[in-house]
Regions:
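Phosphate/nucleotide-binding beta-alpha loop and adjacent structural elements of enzyme active sites
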Residues: 1-191
């Protein structure tokens, strides 16, 4: 598994990309034909809009019912985008979510509710070259529900992280340890 690449980055509230995050990503995928990219926690679609021109297929996951109309409108002109109106986690079911439409800091609050949750593995995606995850601290359940997809496809993984994992008792160190145990290699050290 040493050929699996892992990319970490910090949350970016300014989408002008003055920190060069798009360039950092592109240097790692420039020589690859990107077949499928998965955007987990898409919000209104800033990364989806960036990625759609770099992939044959873009699978977009966003559970926030308040932001979904804007996201759907933003990607509507692109034939390679599929919107999945669900949260992702370690198992299937329903959850309650707290939504902040302005900041994009939506997160799971309870494991009963009206928001559908699935595992990424349940979709049986193949040819996955990049997985972007921005789930406000819920990274470990999302990753555990994507273990087969990750190990089978060996994608670059972009995790947008801050200290929000503390609400679930999850640290960045635990995320790195989990991915390292699956043979992942860290290729950027911005996190």
């Amino acid at each position: 598994g040493g050929n699996i690449a892992l990319f970490f980055m910090t949350v970016q509230k300014d989408f002008s990309d003055k920190n060069g995050n798009y360039d950092i990503l592109l240097k790692h995928v420039a020589d690859r034909q990107l077949r499928r990219i998965i955007d987990v926690g898409a919000w209104w679609g800033p990364w989806s809009l960036f990625w759609q021109s770099h992939a044959e297929k873009l699978e977009i996951f966003e559970p926030n019912k308040k932001i979904l109309p804007m996201l759907a409108q933003n990607i509507s002109k692109f034939n390679n985008c599929t919107l999945h109106k669900t949260a992702l986690g370690e198992s299937k079911g329903t959850v309650s979510m707290a939504y902040d439409t302005h900041s994009g800091t939506n997160h799971v609050t309870d494991f009963k509710g009206d928001t559908e949750i699935n595992t990424l593995d349940s979709y049986s995606f193949d040819n996955v070259d990049v997985i972007k995850i921005d789930v406000e601290g819920y990274e470990i359940p999302v990753l555990k529900g994507a273990k087969h997809t990750i190990i089978t496809n060996q994608p670059i993984i972009q995790i947008e992280g801050n200290s929000s994992g503390q609400r679930y008792g999850i640290s960045k160190k635990q995320i790195m340890e989990l991915l390292t145990s699956w043979g992942m290699t860290r290729i950027e050290k911005k996190w």
